[in-house]
Amino acid sequence: MSALHAFPGGLCLPANKERSTALPIQQAPLAQRYIVPLGQHIGAPARPCVEVGQAVLKGQTIALPDGTVSAALHAPTSGTVVAIGAHPYPHASGLPAPAIVIASDGLERWTELHPCPDFRAESPLALLERIRAAGIGGLGGAGFPTAAKLAARPAEKIHTLVVNGAECEPYISADDLLMRERATQVLGGIDILVQILCPEEVLVGIEDDKPEAIAALGAALGERPYRIVALPTRYPSGGERQLIQLLTGREVPADGLPADIGILCQNVGTLAAVHDAVVLGRPLISRITTLAGGALERPMNVEALIGTPVHELLAFAGLAEGRLERVLMGGPMMGFALPDLSVPLIKTCNCLLAGDATELPEPVPAMPCIRCGDCAQVCPVSLLPQQLHFFALGDEHEQLLAHNLFDCIECGACAYVCPSSIPLVQYYRASKAEIREQRQKLLKAEQSRERFEQRQARLRRDEERRAAERAQRAEKAALARAAQAEREEAAPATAVDPVQAAIERARARKQAGSGSERLKRLKIEASMARVALKKAEKQLLSHDTPEQHGLVAELRAAAEAADKALADAEASLPRDLPSAPPAALDDEAELKKAKAQAAMARAQLKRSEKAFGEAPGAEQRATLDELRAEVERCEATLARLERHAPKPAAPGDDGQAALKRAKIALVGKRAALKKAEQAGVMDSELERLRGELQAAERDLHAAEDACGKPAPELVRIDKRPVDPRIRELKTELAYARAALKKLERLANADAAALAAARARLSAAERALTEHGTE
């Protein structure tokens, strides 16, 4: 590089750094409490890994990074965690933020450190992990996690490392004192980054109003091939993009990063922290901060622990509250006013400016823009601040984006020269926040739309799958019906004429019609009489009068007469009707109906017995008697129909098939009887099932005789009895195995318990083996 380049715009501002650089770096006194916010960096806040009441050591990790773009936090001193929750936070919004509060014990006991003096023997990934574990973020003000910034994408070859020592904003002199007094640490940090990035060139940019810092770095440089470049004092030459343009003449793309053009920029304070983290093993728990302003008796640069309350630092510098106008965190151009002095010092705080009324006067009321163009002349990124102002007033977000609002670095140069005293930067910040919020809403809406479309597609696929399955089942059913039809057509015709059989069944139904109709009418009359009797008995419970007793007696006599008439009619029916079965068993419908009625009657009786309990009342007993009588009638009807039911015989059936069916029928009858005995059904039902079982046994014997198959030869085999000792040993072995498996599944199982369980299993196996060999 033969000559310096220039960036557009900029200002020449009074430095006001003489008072704060008059003293060397001071050490802040130990505070009683330290407030460590979880979000001191760009990206996701850290996750606490300590609990309230837990004792911590100095340098101990108290919060872990939550993701790639995040940074760990460490205890600034030894003590006890007394709170984890919301606390005032140094931010322009004034909103509280979660923090970890540590009460100091005053002992300053360090945790175990892991230094690495010979860092050149380490791999770049190992060095990056050390930087990440130390919780280092950019100390120049942005606070971007350093490890994430250094872990560039593989396609990005960094050829130039730019070291930012410009420190162009008035009052701030923290980097100046750091380079003067700790140049070796700064250069050591550069060496570590060179080990990681392997750049072709290292450029150190320092403004020419810091001759002591330039001399100190030059003296410590030695044989290193780094170039120290003196920059003209012009605000904001310390901006990342402006410094790169000054040193290299290249501009960073509007929507890009310096790494996109092969350049990486780091602040000198960050480099010193990298040196301490790698070489000394110390995490980032302190930083150098400038204490300046007319309200301080002793302006200075102080090395303070992260989390120190601001009011304690200002008191250490001799704060004169009578002269204090307000306190800014940062410089007069880019800083913001602190609403509460109890906020803590954070990693990105490079200056606390306690200004008096002369330095920080009350802002005058803003006047309308006169379109003078001064703001456009001083803008370091060649924007049109007056146009952005008008677009911000009208919430014209598209125009703001078209005019590159997000290229604004919020340096404050436009507001500084504005003759109308318009707070332009505040308008830009508000518009940026609105656009970010709108983008977040659009992103959420897009994500919701995608999820909805995915759900609709999933439902559509499920419906298509179900439709395909239904079509497949319908096709299979159609094929089965077609095959059945073909088999029926191919089957030989039976000897019985179906037309003649239908005529015979119709004639039988006509002959038995009169008796059936009379029996049906008698059943209805008997049922109505019982219902009337039951209703009268219920009324008798609440109206115990002679008239009611007489009515109940009359209804009981009528019900008994109806039951007797029904019983006589059923008894008068012929038991064996040669021509009736075909009519009564038309396609087995009557038999199925009788079975269903019998099952319903038995179920109703069982439910009533369960509901009435062990000691039913008089009315309940009467109901149970009626239900039992109904069950007996249904079973008698079913038995009569089953006697006349023809035995189904398959065409061409031989003796073996009949024997197989008889065996299956016998197994079914046995299962039904066993199930009924376990369910505790009525004795009459059990007798019926036993009779069916005996009939099935007789059918089986007849089938065996008919098939001509010889009876199997029975051979008695003596079964050796089981040794009780073997049974006992096998049981012990099973328990030992189960206990060991249960302990092995536990993640925190005791080693002694595991050893005891294994010993028990070995003993059980050995005992079983020894007994088997006896």
Curated annotation (Swiss-Prot):
Recorded superkingdom: Bacteria
GO molecular function: 4 iron, 4 sulfur cluster binding; electron transfer activity; metal ion binding
One GO CC annotation: plasma membrane
Residues that hold [4Fe-4S] cluster 1 according to the record: C369, C372, C375, C418
Domain 4Fe-4S ferredoxin-type span(s) in chain numbering: 359-389, 399-428
Binding site for [4Fe-4S] cluster 2: C379, C408, C411, C414
GO biological process assignments: electron transport chain
Record's cofactor remark: Binds 2 [4Fe-4S] clusters per subunit.
InterPro entries: 4Fe4S_Fe-S-bd (IPR017896), 4Fe4S_Fe_S_CS (IPR017900), Ion_transpt_RnfC/RsxC (IPR010208), Nuo51_FMN-bd (IPR011538), Nuo51_FMN-bd_sf (IPR037225), RnfC_N (IPR026902), Soluble_ligand-bd (IPR019554)
Positions with biased composition (Basic and acidic residues): 453-490
Region (Disordered): 453-493
Keyword Lipid biosynthesis set for record: no
Amino-acid biosynthesis among keywords: no
Keywords, sorted A to Z: 4Fe-4S, Cell inner membrane, Cell membrane, Electron transport, Iron, Iron-sulfur, Membrane, Metal-binding, Repeat, Translocase, Transport
Entry similarity comment: Belongs to the 4Fe4S bacterial-type ferredoxin family. RnfC subfamily.
Described function: Part of a membrane-bound complex that couples electron transfer with translocation of ions across the membrane.
Record text on subunit structure and interactions: The complex is composed of six subunits: RnfA, RnfB, RnfC, RnfD, RnfE and RnfG.
Name of the protein described by the UniProt record: Ion-translocating oxidoreductase complex subunit C
Organism the protein comes from: Pseudomonas aeruginosa (strain ATCC 15692 / DSM 22644 / CIP 104116 / JCM 14847 / LMG 12228 / 1C / PRS 101 / PAO1)
Lineage: Bacteria, Pseudomonadati, Pseudomonadota, Gammaproteobacteria, Pseudomonadales
Gene it is expressed from: rnfC
